């Protein structure tokens, strides 16, 4: 077995753009023959995947699955809406979802490692960067899910509710985007930040500090209601709050998770005309 030196790994990285561990693995399998390692990496799609790795993957799908009292929600990203609808991409996302449910896997790095070879092969086939971005689980007495297309997914856990009510609550979460279950769940940090914002606004209106503080107290009660599930008007019957709806059914929500494709990812806007002009200058 030939010695796999650091300089050899470095050279392969520079020539292929692949990661250090992938380069070391390829060189080991090729017994130190760098040309053979490159050839094998080309065949496996590893080089193409490495070149696509820097591309921003902000599109994709949200998948949900419930197995009894256990549910998983998953986001898998690609670069375009076109690929998000591709049968091969959808099948890959479904396979990752099934594995997460079966193994109760909530560590995204574990999923990434488990499906890396399949991901690389799919990148080579499709021609876009693909990323298993995040996964989360929810447990409860009664679970419900809702998906708005493939772009928004919600899991809701409740006690004392039937499946229809939980489904309606999941639809509400998808539409209204609450951040907490109840007003009292809003963290002190979030409350303090909003309090300072509202106090600054009130003070800028020229009100004395004592009056401004009383005004803000009223606004803060409204704020904690707006960002919490039970404090929001129920989307299907806005005359009552979700909290009132739950009270009528003698039910309680114990948790929810809402994923939306690409949230928090900065998507690069491409100027097609400028891109074509740049390419023509290079040719």
Swiss-Prot record:
It holds the Pfam family EF_TS. The keyword Translocase does not apply. GO terms for cellular component: cytoplasm. InterPro entries: EF-Ts_dimer_sf (IPR036402), Transl_elong_EFTs/EF1B (IPR001816), Transl_elong_EFTs/EF1B_dimer (IPR014039), Transl_elong_Ts_CS (IPR018101), UBA-like_sf (IPR009060). It is found in: Cytoplasm. It comes from the Bacteria. Its main location: cytoplasm. GO terms for molecular function: translation elongation factor activity. SUPFAM superfamilies: Elongation factor Ts (EF-Ts), dimerisation domain (SSF54713), UBA-like (SSF46934). CDD domains: UBA_EF-Ts. Residues 80-83 are annotated as: Involved in Mg(2+) ion dislocation from EF-Tu. Keywords: Cytoplasm, Elongation factor, Protein biosynthesis. Associates with the EF-Tu.GDP complex and induces the exchange of GDP to GTP. It remains bound to the aminoacyl-tRNA.EF-Tu.GTP complex up to the GTP hydrolysis stage on the ribosome. Belongs to the EF-Ts family. NCBIfam families: tsf. This is Elongation factor Ts. The gene is tsf.
